[in-house]
């Protein structure tokens, strides 16, 4: 493109330019020129505005305006060619133009400001991961903030301070000590759990050396050093040295052992989260970045493997840690947890550069100061329960002495001995008297009990006279430390952080008693020491939102500034916190989701540490920083109390697998003793009317619903032909629409590629549901319609997953929220269509019915077009799917159409509406919507796995299958159906939950075992010792069962030669659609749908996988994380169940999401 430089002499141009340039540059005088100046000082005589204006054109006004606008906004739309136009403008000006020089300077400044100077990130190996001691955070100042370096000073102390300050013991006894009879609960009912995290944060960045108070033994970064250690030796002590794991339920800090047990239990959750993370990282192995050695003697390779996993796992765990700090801790501090808002104070905000502002620096490092060491001493918030625990623990350490009266020297000596007696090996330490189990971990139920009691424990309030007496020696030491540091006064510090100084003792604290004591000790507010002053300050009142922590006024402001500095200054939380550094999955796993809990994220920590104790919507796991009773009031006010469970955590019994075909059939056929578990989810999605839907229960009403649905689905005689043709035509259309040539040129055959799962199989089923139930789809290039095709597919999968695949407790609430929103939208659209259908509205609908009566033709009318079998023109709910030119052809000029099933669907809806005379809304939510929910996801899953089998292990069958597909006869189609069902049986992975409602015993066997030669664990072997594997399972009431249809499909007792494709198996023998009273009601339709899509795919010339990982389905043996690494699986036998990942591998998925295929062709299908 050439940008014109045409000179525009429009009237008034000179005046407009002169005004603009005067506004930008001002009216400056030319400098005086001296004729006898030194030779090297001569400068060209600058030209003025008049000369500039003569050179410029009308379009240059726009260029200057765009330049100014870009400078103010900090964003340059390069499609406007601003840079090129500025160069053209500058090139027109005289060489010595004064204004031209300023514009050039501005352009250079803009280009300079586009980059960091100096850079804040580096590709050096020494900067990839956190160092154990925190060094190398700032790549230019590697020791900044490292452990074992001096504290910083924030505030210059200028005020003359009394050389004889008040006695520390007197300060404590008059301003700080708590009267045991006058405990003040926190005004916002914050639980002790928040202050346990505060304790971890404090000891993460402040650990004063007992030998030199000026030295900080830990780093100045929030890097979880209490868990990981402060140096290399401490870090190696908590690591197993294998697979990136930490030793089970360990943490580095000895000091934590001396705190209430909830602090240690909190750290153990981070330990377990870390081990969960590295286990999943190794499983996914994104891009092959974690190279597992192939030989046991490759010592260096194993060390690299372990370290890469450990360091990446640490970055991810710290990422969750900082998101908990910002998303849960800071939100509670600001009382945002009481407001219906997702706003949060997140220092990692992305600021743009502009003329009016520059972004706050980031990744510059940090060095904590002595002032903030004092700010973070919050002993007044110790609860009554923890006061008693601490007093007893200190009394025991003191040999029976009361810590409230013991000398400071005795207390320090006793605490030193206490820490000395703690084993150096973290795995040998205990917590609250708990005993380690054989796997090295503590008992989950006992840890959960500690956490539950801590969540229910109301913390203390801030303010004077509220520090437990047992902390007397600790507080006296703190006052003495502050004096050795020569810190500034309270007022000096307040001025430093931008607050007004206290002008009176009353301003500091209106309590007359406190005022009198302060006046006696310090004479003037300006003389009050920082630490005693903070402890004596009044606490802020609650504001909702605004003030939730309610600390002293100075603390309230200071901690927010410090939080911003700690996070924004940390390279690993800013410029290097990227999916590339911590993997897509790791980035996603640690991230907050504003759609869940308003951005709170601590539930991930609870659920990964204790997956079998907290319900998916437990308020204990989602909001532990406020006691449950107060949370109940908060959520009632927000109208969200019914979203959460208020029951205390409780261990759930392990899931019992049922594996053999005989046992599977026995369980699935018995509705009396084994009940389906889908009812609550179906009710959640569709409301009370859905409780009688076929799959929602095992009562007579559910059975009646099943019979009604089957009758409605299969009543039309022509339904098989309708379904078959729909899927064949639709599949061709999707291949044409989404396939693209990737090799070859010219008019000859070219290699095409398509994501067959995402863009063909899934969308074919989604289109079927849209056409059948008149869900309006958006046409290509248009905005009309309620759904894009992929959007509808995702909605259907999400709804299905909430009912049948809700197995990840951590993501369950998010899944339920998303599925509920999708179901509500879908229900409303279907109900609207049903009402219009019942009213008989729509001209084309009436015309179609009339034509049907007159001609007897098979007429399908929708809202926008007509299909007749004589003309072959199809439309869906909104029109014709075309390739952009309006018509698809098969090469012979015959139009390809996107067929509609609307009349078939409308008849189906009419039949469903006839049930029991229910209202439209009741029928839609109770029958129609559940039918829609049940269709797409499972069919996509089965066909994807079937195709995967035949493009891999079963490829020897492809030539015969392709031959059959090309015959296009009913006999050939029947054989293709058998091939399809066999592929689904061999590679499909299906299981169904059941609940035991009466004590039972089931005889079961293990029909197949893992194949050691198959690293994917997808191909089992028949168990040669199946008779010896016989066992009787004692099932008590309440037991959850997973009825494994995958193992049943590989049981030789039911399927001889289970690993071979055999076409002599009866269609009714297959179990991947279920067995018994709840066998899939839509199985006949599904069979035709699957085989029809498969048929079209087989007709592709040269059908094959795309090369490399793109052509493979990434899957892993399904297993439930047991809460800690090293625990043996509850049922180690082969299950055949698989888990998958999203296409970008950022999340696990219950079904395959992507697989690319290639074929040869000219693009016509």
UniProtKB/Swiss-Prot annotation:
Heme b binds at residues 203, 379. Heme binds at residue 1080. The N-terminus is blocked. InterPro entries: Cyt_P450, Cyt_P450_CS, Cyt_P450_sf, Haem_peroxidase_animal, Haem_peroxidase_sf, Haem_peroxidase_sf_animal, Oxylipin_biosynth_metab, Ppo-like_N. Its cofactor is heme b; Ca(2+); heme. The active site is at residue 376. It catalyses: (9Z,12Z)-octadecadienoate + O2 = (8R,9Z,12Z)-8-hydroperoxyoctadeca-9,12-dienoate; (8R,9Z,12Z)-8-hydroperoxyoctadeca-9,12-dienoate = (7S,8S,9Z,12Z)-7,8-dihydroxyoctadeca-9,12-dienoate. Residues 1114-1134 are annotated as: Disordered. Optimum pH is 7.2-7.4. Ca(2+) binds at residues 204, 219, 221, 223, 225. One of its GO terms (molecular function) is linoleate 8R-lipoxygenase activity. Keywords: Dioxygenase, Heme, Iron, Isomerase, Metal-binding, Oxidoreductase, Peroxidase. Its EC number is 1.13.11.60, 5.4.4.6. CDD domains: CYP_LDS-like_C, linoleate_diol_synthase_like. Residues 666-1161 are annotated as: Epoxy alcohol synthase. Pfam families: An_peroxidase, p450. 7,8-linoleate diol synthase is a bifunctional enzyme that converts linoleic acid (18:2n-6) into 8-hydroperoxy-8(E),12(Z)-octadecadienoic acid (8-HPODE) and then catalyzes the isomerization of the resulting hydroperoxide to 7,8-dihydroxy-9(Z),12(Z)-octadecadienoic acid (7,8-DiHODE). Homotetramer. Belongs to the peroxidase family. This is Linoleate diol synthase.
């Amino acid at each position: 493109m050439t940008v014109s430089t045409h000179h525009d002499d429009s009237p008034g141009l000179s005046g407009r330019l002169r005004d603009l340039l005067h506004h930008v540059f001002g009216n400056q005088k030319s400098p005086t020129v001296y004729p006898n100046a030194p030779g090297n000082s001569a400068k060209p005589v600058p030209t003025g505005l008049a000369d500039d204006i003569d050179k410029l054109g009308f379009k240059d006004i726009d260029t200057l305006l765009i330049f100014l606008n870009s400078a103010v906004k900090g964003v340059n739309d390069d499609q406007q060619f601003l840079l090129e136009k500025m160069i053209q403008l500058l090139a027109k000006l005289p060489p010595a133009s004064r204004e031209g020089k300023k514009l050039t300077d501005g352009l250079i400044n803009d280009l300079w400001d586009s980059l960091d100077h100096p850079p804040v990130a580096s590709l050096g190996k020494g900067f990839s991961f956190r160092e154990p001691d925190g060094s190398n955070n700032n790549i230019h100042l590697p020791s900044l903030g490292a452990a074992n370096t001096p504290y910083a000073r924030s505030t210059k102390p200028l005020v003359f301070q009394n050389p004889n300050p008040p006695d520390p013991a007197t300060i404590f006894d008059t301003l700080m000590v708590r009267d045991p009879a006058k405990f003040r609960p926190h005004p916002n009912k914050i639980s002790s759990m928040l202050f346990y995290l505060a304790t971890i944060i404090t000891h993460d960045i402040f650990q004063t050396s007992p030998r030199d108070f000026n030295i900080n033994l830990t780093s100045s970064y929030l890097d979880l050093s209490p868990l990981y250690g402060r140096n290399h030796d401490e870090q190696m002590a908590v690591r197993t040295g294998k697979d990136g794991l930490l030793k089970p339920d360990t943490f580095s800090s000895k000091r934590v052992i001396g705190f209430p047990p909830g602090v240690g239990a909190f750290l153990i959750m981070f330990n377990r989260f870390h081990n969960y993370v590295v286990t999943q990282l190794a499983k996914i192995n994104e891009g092959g970045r974690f190279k597992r050695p192939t030989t046991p003697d490759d010592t260096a390779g194993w060390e690299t493997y372990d370290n890469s996993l450990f360091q990446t796992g640490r970055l991810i765990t710290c990422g969750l840690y900082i998101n908990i700090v910002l998303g849960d801790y800071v939100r509670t501090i600001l009382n945002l947890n009481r407001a219906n808002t997702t706003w949060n104070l997140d220092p990692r905000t992305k600021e743009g550069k502009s003329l009016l502002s520059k972004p706050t620096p980031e990744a510059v490092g940090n060095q904590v100061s002595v002032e903030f060491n004092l700010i973070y001493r919050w002993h007044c918030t110790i609860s009554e329960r923890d006061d008693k625990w601490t007093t007893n623990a200190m009394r025991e350490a003191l040999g029976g002495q009361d810590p409230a009266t013991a000398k400071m020297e005795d207390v320090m000596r006793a605490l030193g001995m206490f820490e000395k007696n703690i084993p150096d090996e973290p795995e040998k330490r205990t917590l609250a008297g708990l005993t380690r189990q054989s796997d090295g971990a503590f008992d989950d139920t006992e840890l959960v009990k500690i956490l539950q009691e801590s969540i229910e424990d109301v913390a203390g309030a801030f303010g004077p006279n509220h520090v437990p007496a047992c902390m007397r020696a600790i507080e006296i030491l703190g006052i003495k430390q502050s004096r050795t540091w020569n810190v500034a006064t309270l007022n000096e510090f307040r001025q430093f952080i931008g607050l007004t100084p206290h002008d009176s003792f009353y301003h500091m604290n209106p309590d007359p008693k406190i005022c009198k004591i302060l006046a006696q000790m310090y004479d003037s507010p300006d003389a009050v020491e920082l630490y005693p002053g903070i402890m004596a300050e009044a606490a802020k009142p609650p504001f909702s939102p605004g003030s939730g922590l309610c600390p002293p006024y100075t603390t309230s402001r200071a901690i927010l500034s410090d939080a911003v500095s700690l996070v924004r200054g940390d390279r690993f939380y800013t410029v290097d916190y990227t999916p590339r550094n911590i993997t897509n999955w790791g980035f996603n796993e640690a991230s907050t989701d504003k759609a869940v809990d308003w951005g709170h994220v601590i539930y991930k920590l609870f659920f990964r540490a204790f997956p079998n104790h907290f319900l998916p919507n437990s308020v204990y796991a989602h909001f532990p920083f406020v006691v449950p009773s107060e949370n109940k009031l908060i959520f009632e006010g927000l109208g969200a109390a019914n979203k959460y469970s208020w029951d205390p955590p409780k261990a759930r019994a392990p899931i019992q697998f049922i594996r053999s075909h005989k046992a599977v059939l026995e369980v699935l056929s018995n509705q009396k003793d084994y009940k389906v578990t889908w009812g609550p989810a179906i009710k959640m999605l569709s409301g009370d009317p859905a409780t009688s839907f076929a799959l929602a229960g095992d009562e007579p009403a559910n059975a009646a619903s099943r019979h009604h649905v089957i009758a409605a689905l299969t009543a039309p005689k022509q339904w098989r032909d309708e379904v078959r043709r729909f899927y064949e035509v639709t599949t061709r259309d999707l291949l044409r629409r989404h396939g693209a040539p990737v090799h070859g040129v010219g008019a000859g055959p070219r290699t095409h590629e398509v994501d067959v799962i995402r863009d063909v199989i899934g969308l074919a089923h989604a289109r079927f549901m849209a056409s059948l139930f008149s869900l309006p789809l958006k046409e290509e290039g248009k905005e009309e319609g309620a759904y894009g095709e992929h959007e509808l597919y995702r909605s259907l999968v999400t709804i299905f997953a909430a009912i049948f695949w809700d197995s990840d407790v951590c993501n369950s609430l998010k899944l339920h929220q998303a599925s509920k929103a999708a179901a509500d939208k879908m229900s409303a659209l279907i109900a609207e269509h049903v009402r219009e259908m019942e009213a008989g509205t729509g001209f084309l609908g009436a015309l179609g019915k009339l034509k049907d009566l007159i001609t007897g033709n098979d007429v399908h009318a929708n809202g926008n077009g007509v299909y007749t079998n004589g003309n072959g023109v199809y439309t869906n709910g909104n029109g014709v799917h075309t390739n952009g030119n309006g018509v698809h052809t098969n090469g012979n000029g015959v139009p390809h159409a996107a067929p509609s099933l609307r009349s078939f669907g409308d008849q189906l809806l009419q039949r469903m509406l006839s049930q029991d005379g229910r209202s439209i809304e009741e029928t839609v939510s109770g029958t129609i919507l559940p039918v829609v929910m049940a269709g797409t996801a499972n069919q996509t899953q089965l066909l994807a796995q079937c195709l995967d089998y035949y493009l891999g292990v079963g490829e020897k069958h492809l030539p015969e299958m392709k031959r059959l597909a090309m015959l296009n006869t009913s006999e050939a189609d029947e054989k293709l159906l058998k091939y399809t069902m066999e592929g689904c049986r061999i590679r499909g992975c299906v299981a169904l939950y059941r609940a035991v409602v009466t004590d039972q015993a089931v005889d079961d066997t293990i029909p197949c075992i893992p194949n050691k030669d198959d690293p994917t664990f997808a191909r089992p072997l028949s168990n040669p010792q199946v008779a010896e594997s016989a066992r009787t399972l004692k099932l008590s009431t309440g037991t959850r069962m997973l009825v494994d249809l995958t193992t049943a499909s590989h049981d030789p007792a039911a399927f001889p030669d289970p690993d071979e494709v055999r076409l002599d198996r009866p269609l009714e023998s297959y179990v991947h659609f279920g067995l018994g009273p709840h066998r899939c009601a839509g199985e006949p339709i599904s069979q035709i749908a699957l085989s029809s899509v498969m048929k079209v795919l087989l007709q592709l010339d040269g059908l094959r996988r795309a090369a490399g990982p793109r052509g493979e389905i990434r899957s892993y043996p399904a297993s439930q994380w047991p809460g800690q690494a090293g625990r043996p699986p509850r049922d180690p036998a082969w299950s055949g169940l698989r888990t998958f990942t999203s296409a970008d591998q950022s999340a696990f998925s219950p079904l395959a999401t992507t697989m690319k295929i290639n074929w040869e062709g000219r693009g016509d299908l």
